[in-house]
UniProtKB/Swiss-Prot annotation:
Reported function: May be involved in a process influencing telomere capping.
Species for this entry: Eremothecium gossypii (strain ATCC 10895 / CBS 109.51 / FGSC 9923 / NRRL Y-1056) (Yeast)
Bias type Basic and acidic residues, positions: 29-41, 49-61
UniProt biased composition (Low complexity): 71-97
Entry protein name: Restriction of telomere capping protein 4
Region (Disordered): 17-100, 354-407
Main location: cytoplasm
UniProt feature, compositional bias: Basic residues: 372-384, 392-401
Localization, UniProt: Cytoplasm; Nucleus
InterPro entries: RTC4, RTC4_C
GO cellular component terms, A-Z: cytoplasm; nucleus
Keyword entries, A-Z: Cytoplasm, Nucleus
Record carries keyword rRNA-binding: no
Family in the record: Belongs to the RTC4 family.
Amino acid sequence: MSHVRRKRITAIYSTSMKDDNAMIVKSHSSKESKRDPRVELSDNEYISNDEKDSTDAKPAADEPQLELNCSSSLSSSDDDSSVSSSISSSSELDALSEPGLSSPNAVPLVYKVPHESSKAIQVARRLENIHASVQKDDDYMPKLCINKSMVFTDRQDQVAEYERLLEIRLKYKNAFKVPPTLFADQLLSKAEKYIPLVEEILRGERPSMYYDNARKAYQKSSRALLSVEEFRQLDLKTFTAGYFGIKRQIRLSTEILSQYQDKLSKHRNPTVQWWGPTDFSHYVLAPEILSYVCRDELGLADIDEAWTYMESTTEYGLNVADEEPLDIWELEYEEKKLQRLGLGPKYSSMTYRKHPARASAVVDTSKNGSKEHKRKGKQHKLKKGQQSTKIRVSKKRRRVQPHSICD
């Protein structure tokens, strides 16, 4: 054992070390035995009774203080000696931090809590109390339940809407023999051959009822362009493609714009400029092209009859046709909705329409028919030629005369 260690032990315990393996017995007073046995005593805790009394006599500070029991221990080896310090465990610090539980032998390190930190602690406690009260109110709040009468009313409204559509459908089917509503592919296939008529309409070489209505709307306006307020005041029934409806009318207009967007944008006609390329295509050109499709579907004599028919079936287009699926993939949604509402086949649009796939199969079968089919085809072409001749001759009795759209 080194000389420094022997001298240190002799000074603390007042006994001499006879050899390196001598047993050291420490005697503790009754006051020290009351301390926590779990806390290991360090060498610096062996102080005189006078120092203990002076430590106990220190008054407690008014402000919060944090007392740390710091102890130092010396360790040495045969070669050299070093000094190390240790801090008691967190459980001991917590115990010593409470008033009245401070160790008499502890070396107090006074720590003053900043005023800002105390305020932060108070605010945090207030927030915790508020959160607890809110959580308590949420626990007692009754859960929101869906009212069954609301669901039943919504179902009743949907069923009533289908009843109304069925009534309008049957009314126009009986009075006007409205053709089956076309899908988007069918519509574009029938209207494709009439799209080039846009050139003649823009040059003023072909009369147009819808252009005449558009020009009247422009003449009533005092603005250079069609405003939102003026558009809302327009009677859109005069710009609707009859039984085709607005939805199919807009679909055809998209195809027209893909071909004539630039030409419409650069056109110098004041009516075209007032409406703008998009609206002029939506509400003038598209319904005009669909008028020729209507003439073919119904086998009418001239375009005047088609215009009259289109004006008479506008209610059907806005209420029935616009509610029917435009594409084939929408049929599944319609069927599921009818099943959910418990409605029969008479409410389905496919009861009054032809599926495009089945219709194309019928056309392919008819193409392989007999000579009688070819003979009827020639007669049909002859009748169609006679009708077109009659249309060209009857220009004088049309209510819509060719317009000077180029001016």
